[in-house]
Amino acid sequence: MATQAVQVFGKKKNATAVARCVQGKGLIKVNGVPLKLYAPEILRAKLYEPILLLGTDKFAEVDIRLKVSGGGHVSQVYAVRQAIAKAIVAYYAKYVDEHSKNTLKTALIQFDRTLLVADPRRCEPKKFGGKGARSRFQKSYR
């Protein structure tokens, strides 16, 4: 029998995290590093949000391996947490049942919508007449 696997991605600004969720024993690795060792310690709590919210029992029978690139540290953490949440929902939708998928989805959306839906905000391009997108050079009348 072929392995039960789903592949999803999470995005934030320029950071993209690709998650592959397969049947396993609860292993979660980001770029080959275990989740408990990844990222600055302060941001690690953000990574654990979908896991703590849904309960570790939901993640006990799956392995999630993620590859993240682009963006900064914070963007990468947000992309990873989105990929983890989307991966577990997609796995439950495909291989478990529709009812449990819906309960997972509603729990995630009630907590934080960006766990499943990408943030559309992007950096606005710079325009002439100033040093940024909106700021203008100082005007002198005399």
Swiss-Prot record:
It is found in: Cytoplasm. GO terms for biological process: maturation of SSU-rRNA from tricistronic rRNA transcript (SSU-rRNA, 5.8S rRNA, LSU-rRNA); translation. Keywords: Cytoplasm, Ribonucleoprotein, Ribosomal protein. GO terms for cellular component: cytosolic small ribosomal subunit. PROSITE patterns: RIBOSOMAL_S9. One of its GO terms (molecular function) is structural constituent of ribosome. Pfam families: Ribosomal_S9. Component of the ribosome, a large ribonucleoprotein complex responsible for the synthesis of proteins in the cell. The small ribosomal subunit (SSU) binds messenger RNAs (mRNAs) and translates the encoded message by selecting cognate aminoacyl-transfer RNA (tRNA) molecules. The large subunit (LSU) contains the ribosomal catalytic site termed the peptidyl transferase center (PTC), which catalyzes the formation of peptide bonds, thereby polymerizing the amino acids delivered by tRNAs into a polypeptide chain. Component of the small ribosomal subunit (SSU). Mature N.crassa ribosomes consist of a small (40S) and a large (60S) subunit. The 40S small subunit contains 1 molecule of ribosomal RNA (18S rRNA) and at least 32 different proteins. The large 60S subunit contains 3 rRNA molecules (26S, 5.8S and 5S rRNA) and at least 42 different proteins. Belongs to the universal ribosomal protein uS9 family. PANTHER family: RIBOSOMAL PROTEIN S16, RIBOSOMAL PROTEIN S9. This is Small ribosomal subunit protein uS9. It comes from Neurospora crassa (strain ATCC 24698 / 74-OR23-1A / CBS 708.71 / DSM 1257 / FGSC 987).
